[in-house]
Amino acid sequence: DLWQFGQMILKETGKIPFPYYGAYGCYCGWGGRGGKPKAGTDRCCYVHDCCYGKLTSCPKTDDRYSYSWLDGTIVCGEDDPCKELCECDKKIAVCFRENLGTYNKKYRYHLKSCKKADKPC
């Protein structure tokens, strides 16, 4: 669910998720707007959208899953029916951390150059 997802992002990046990533670039935020991803951070969101699109179990983004932290690493519950969803959220949280250096405030609320998707997943 969004709360769990936000907690992963906060712990991985130290950033409060909504103001930082809620409307960033062409893909960060509810349902990407399309176009070419804006640098690494926005690419994380593009990949996350694709990951959600490929879910075969627990396709609702508001479903809860089990996860824990082990030595600073997110571990998704092995037998959880929503493990795929957890793995998608884990990947983007880690991607955000790895791409903190690509974050550019000029891409917040940046809609002008975002068009229909031109990159298939």
UniProtKB/Swiss-Prot annotation:
Record's signal peptide: none
Tissue note: Expressed by the venom gland.
Keywords: Calcium, Disulfide bond, Hydrolase, Lipid degradation, Lipid metabolism, Metal-binding, Myotoxin, Neurotoxin, Presynaptic neurotoxin, Secreted, Toxin
Main subcellular localisation: secreted
Gene3D superfamilies listed in its UniProt record: Phospholipase A2 domain
Role summary: Snake venom phospholipase A2 (PLA2) that induces a slight blockade of neuromuscular contraction in an indirectly stimulated chick biventer cervicis nerve-muscle preparation. Does not inhibit contraction of chick biventer cervicic nerve-muscle preparation in response to treatment with acetylcholine or KCl. The neuromuscular blockade is mediated by inhibitory action at the presynaptic motor nerve endings. Lyses skeletal myoblasts and myotubes in vitro, and intramuscular injection causes local muscle necrosis. Induces edema in the mouse foot pad. Induces a transient increase of IL-6 levels.
The name this protein goes by in its record: Basic phospholipase A2 BmjeTX-I
